[in-house]
Amino acid sequence: DSLGRVNLTWQINDTKMVYATWSEGYRPGGINRKGTLPPYTSDFLTNYELGWKTTWGNVFVFNGALFRQDWDDFQFSYLGQNGLTEIRNANSAQIDGLELDLSWAATYNLQLTGGFAWYDAKLTANYCGWIKPNGEPETVCPNGTVDPNGNVVSGPQAAEGTQLPITPQFKGSVNARYTWDMAGGEAYWQASLSHAGRRRVDMREAETA
């Protein structure tokens, strides 16, 4: 398989530009550490991104990007009953996001910066927990379905729309740095604050209820 990338850039002037990117990527498959578990396959990503980089009056920088990522055979992991990490494939997932970063030279000595991000990361198909004979993750498993091991399931382990693991819905940070001359060099003090929203460790609903 081949991967593609297309990038278009418009340099509005010396201090402002916008860009659009379409790109593809993948993560290789592999074998789980526990030999009785099935191997996991490669997953594939298609990324659509629109962004900008701007400077205003040599004192204010404002950059940002809007993006969508579509995942096929999405890889995710969780801690299994034996204490080993298990990697599985879900059918499909999507991440919509907005990322912003700002910098302001408030005075000659004081620099203020901040970064903010919002993500809507979710499954776009049910995750049932097993693979179909054609190698694709099963997505249809209503209450009463019998899985390949003969167990009757009560529904998908993670339903369409479930938040993806590890990815918070929001994160942000701010930083202030004050610099001054001292003893022929420079000294500074710096203060930072960061926050990240709630994150799921395990995507499966029974494990996070």
What are these regions (language model features)?
Residues 11-25, 42-105, 111-117, 121-127:
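Membrane-embedded beta-barrel scaffold of Gram-negative outer-membrane proteins
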